[in-house]
From Swiss-Prot:
Entry keyword set: Cell wall, Repeat, Secreted, Virulence
Chief place of localization: secreted
Sequence ranges of the NHL repeats: 291-321, 333-363, 379-404, 419-447
Subcellular location: Secreted, Cell wall
Induction behaviour: Highly up-regulated during the early stages of invasion of the human blood-brain barrier.
Boundaries of every PE domain copy: 1-92
Organism: Mycobacterium tuberculosis (strain ATCC 25618 / H37Rv)
Record protein name field: PE-PGRS family protein PE_PGRS18
Length: 457
C-alpha cells in the first residue's frame, strides 16, 4: 500500500503556470504565420524554389505548433480537474475525522465539562471569564478573558495530561480612587508534559480625579501556572501601574507582580519570574492667579473643590474633571476653614478677621448668608445631622450653628486655649477640637454636642 500527499493549492498553481506556457506558444504561432507565404525575390526559377522552401517550413511549424497547443490545453484541463478532485477528497476525509472526534468528546464533555481531546475555549475579554480547560488526554487550556474596570482577570484554563496552561487575563483598571483589579492566575500545564500559563497583568490603579485624593494602587499580577512533570512554570504577571493622584495629593505605588509558577515534578523546569511592580502615579499641581495664601479645602458631593484664599478674601472653585479653576467667590475677611454639609450640600467658610461664617450655595456658587460667631473664627466641621461646629481661636470657644435656621444655637462651648482644628466622627457624631496653646484635644459629645472633656497630648 502506498500513500500520496497532495496539496491542492500547489496543483492549482502548477495549472496556472502551464496555462501561461500555452499563452506563450500561441504568441509564437501567431508570429510565425507571416513565414508561411514567402514571395520570390525575382521571377527566375531559383528565387521561386527558395521561396517555396521557406513557405513549406513555415507551414510545417504551424502544424506542429497547433498540435503542441492542443496537448497543452488538455494538460492544463487535467491539472485543474485534479486540483478540484484532491480538494473534494481532502474535505470528504476531514469531515469523518471530525465526526469521530466529536463522538468521542461528547460524552466526556457532558460528564466532566471538558473534552477528551481538544483545546479549551478562551474567555471573553472585558468579562473576566475564565479560560476553558484543555482535553483530559490532549489539549491546551484557554486564555482567561480580561476584566472590566474594577474586575479581576479570568484564570487561564488548565491542560490535561499533555498540553500548556492558558494565560491569565489582565485585571481591569481600577475605578476612580480605587486599586486596579488583580490579574488572573495562569493555568497549570499538563500533568505529564506542558508549561504553565503566564499570570495576567494587574490592572492600573484608578486615577485620583479629586483635589487632594490619591489614585488607587496598581493591581497585583496573576500567579504563574505550575508546569507539568516535564515543563516550565508560567511567569508571574506584572503588577499594575499605580493610579495618578489628584491635585496636591500623594502618588500611589504600583503593586508587585505575581509569583512565578513552580514545577510540579522533580524533572520540571524553573518556575516563572514574578512580574515587576507598577510605576507610581503622578501628582497633579494646580496653579491659578486667584490663589492667594490658599488655606482651607473641601469637596462637595458633586465633586467640586472649594479653596479659601486668606490673602484675597475669596473662595476658588475647581472643576474635578479638568482640575482647573472655574470660578472665584468674594467672601468675608480672612477666609480660613471650609466644610460641606453632607445633608444639604451647602458650603460653610469661616472668616477669621470678620468673625463670621459665610454660607455658599453650590448650585449658584454665591454667598447666601453670613452668620456671626466668636472672635477669630478658624476651623469648621459638619456632623452627620447637619450641625456646624466652628472654632473661635481668640474666644477659646466653639460655636454651634443650627442648619435649619443658619443661626448660632445656645451659648458658645468653652474648650482649651487657642482652638484651631475641628473634626467630627461620622459614626458617633463626637466632635474633636485641637487646642494649640495648652496642647490638648477637647472631646465634645451630645446632640447637638455640648458636653466637653479635654485630654492632654
Amino acid at each position: 500500500m502506498s500513500f500520496v500527499n497532495v496539496a491542492p493549492q500547489l496543483v492549482s498553481t502548477a495549472a496556472a503556470d502551464a496555462a501561461r506556457i500555452g499563452s506563450a506558444i500561441n504568441t509564437a504561432n501567431t508570429a510565425a504565420a507571416a513565414t508561411t507565404q514567402v514571395l520570390a525575390a525575382a521571377h527566375d526559377e531559383v528565387s521561386t524554389a527558395i521561396a517555396a522552401l521557406f513557405g513549406s517550413h513555415g507551414q510545417h511549424y504551424q502544424a506542429i505548433s497547433a498540435q503542441v497547443a492542443a496537448y497543452q490545453e488538455r494538460f492544463v484541463l487535467a491539472l485543474s480537474q485534479a486540483s478540484s478532485t484532491y480538494a473534494v477528497a481532502e474535505a470528504a476525509s476531514a469531515t469523518p475525522l471530525q465526526n469521530v472526534l466529536d463522538a468521542i468528546n461528547a460524552p466526556v464533555q457532558s460528564l466532566t465539562g471538558r473534552p477528551l481531546i481538544g483545546d479549551g475555549a478562551n474567555g471573553i475579554d472585558g468579562t473576566g471569564q475564565a479560560g476553558g480547560n484543555g482535553g483530559w488526554l490532549w489539549g491546551n487550556g484557554g486564555n482567561g478573558g480580561s476584566g472590566a474596570p474594577g474586575q479581576a482577570g479570568g484564570a487561564g484554563g488548565a491542560a490535561g495530561l499533555i498540553g500548556n496552561g492558558g494565560a491569565g487575563g489582565a485585571g481591569g483598571q481600577g475605578l476612580p480612587f480605587e486599586a486596579g483589579a488583580n490579574g488572573g492566575a495562569g493555568g497549570a500545564g499538563g500533568w505529564l508534559f506542558g508549561n504553565g500559563g503566564a499570570g495576567g497583568v494587574g490592572g492600573a490603579g484608578g486615577a485620583g480625579t479629586t483635589f487632594g485624593v490619591a489614585g488607587g494602587d496598581g493591581g497585583t499580577g496573576g500567579v504563574g501556572g505550575h508546569g507539568g512533570l516535564i515543563g516550565v512554570g508560567g511567569h508571574g504577571g506584572d503588577g499594575g501601574t499605580g493610579g495618578t493622584g489628584g491635585a496636591v495629593s500623594l502618588a500611589r505605588a504600583g503593586t508587585a507582580g505575581g509569583a512565578g509558577g513552580g514545577p510540579a515534578g522533580g524533572i520540571g523546569g524553573a518556575g516563572g519570574v514574578g512580574g515587576a511592580g507598577g510605576a507610581a502615579g503622578a501628582v497633579t499641581t494646580i496653579t491659578h492667579a486667584s490663589f492667594n495664601d490658599p488655606h482651607g479645602v473641601a469637596v462637595n458631593p458633586g465633586g467640586n473643590i472649594y479653596v479659601t484664599n486668606q490673602g484675597s478674601n475669596t473662595v476658588s472653585v475647581i472643576d474635578p474633571v479638568t482640575n482647573t479653576v472655574t470660578g472665584s467667590i468674594t467672601d468675608g475677611n480672612g477666609p480660613s476653614g471650609v466644610a460641606v454639609s453632607p445633608v444639604t450640600g451647602l458650603v460653610f467658610v469661616t472668616n477669621f478677621d470678620s468673625n463670621t461664617v459665610s454660607v455658599i450655595d453650590p448650585n449658584t456658587n454665591t454667598v447666601t448668608g453670613s452668620i456671626p460667631v466668636g472672635t477669630g473664627a478658624y476651623g469648621v466641621a459638619v456632623n452627620p445631622g447637619g450641625n456646624i461646629y466652628v472654632t473661635n481661636q481668640f474666644s477659646n470657644t466653639v460655636s454651634v450653628i443650627d442648619p435649619a435656621t443658619n443661626t448660632v444655637t445656645g451659648s458658645p462651648i468653652p474648650v482649651g486655649l487657642d482652638p484651631t482644628g475641628v473634626a467630627v466622627n461620622p459614626v458617633t457624631g463626637v466632635v474633636y477640637v485641637t487646642n494649640s496653646l495648652d496642647d490638648t484635644v477637647s472631646v465634645i459629645t451630645g446632640e447637638p454636642a455640648r458636653s466637653v472633656c479635654s485630654a492632654a497630648i
